[in-house]
Amino acid sequence: MKNLAGLMKQASQMQAKMGEMQAKLETVEAEGSAGAGMVTVTLNGKGDLRRLHIDPKLADPAETEMLEDLIVAAHNDAKKKIETMAAEEMQKVTGGLNLPAGMKLPF
């Protein structure tokens, strides 16, 4: 019974740390770029788009398809960086315990 109480306490502490991590992820940002920096996007740790920069040279209507591709590529680049940051923070919180992404503790 003592082990169960210790496990419950540890799970509660881990849940609190995960809450702190979620709050921290709202404040961190990652920038992704494509086309040698002609398109850059900045996402917060939750994956929300915060900023988008498009080089004015890409404003040519004939380049619309390329511009769309570069925006998608820059967004995906930033998203990968955010996912890496989140995974690193999760490792710190869980002490290396590999939990599935998005797993909520039941305590």
Swiss-Prot record:
HAMAP family found in the cross-reference section: DNA_YbaB_EbfC
Subcellular location: Cytoplasm, Nucleoid
GO cellular component: bacterial nucleoid; cytosol
Keywords from the named record: Cytoplasm, DNA-binding
MF-aspect GO terms: DNA binding
Main subcellular localisation: cytoplasm
Protein name: Nucleoid-associated protein GbCGDNIH1_0260
Protein's UniProt keywords contain Aminoacyl-tRNA synthetase: no
Description of how the protein assembles with itself and partners: Homodimer.
Function as written in the Swiss-Prot or TrEMBL entry: Binds to DNA and alters its conformation. May be involved in regulation of gene expression, nucleoid organization and DNA protection.
Family membership: Belongs to the YbaB/EbfC family.
Record-linked SUPFAM superfamilies: YbaB-like
InterPro entries found in the cross-reference section: YbaB-like_sf, YbaB/EbfC
Pfam families from the UniProt entry: YbaB_DNA_bd
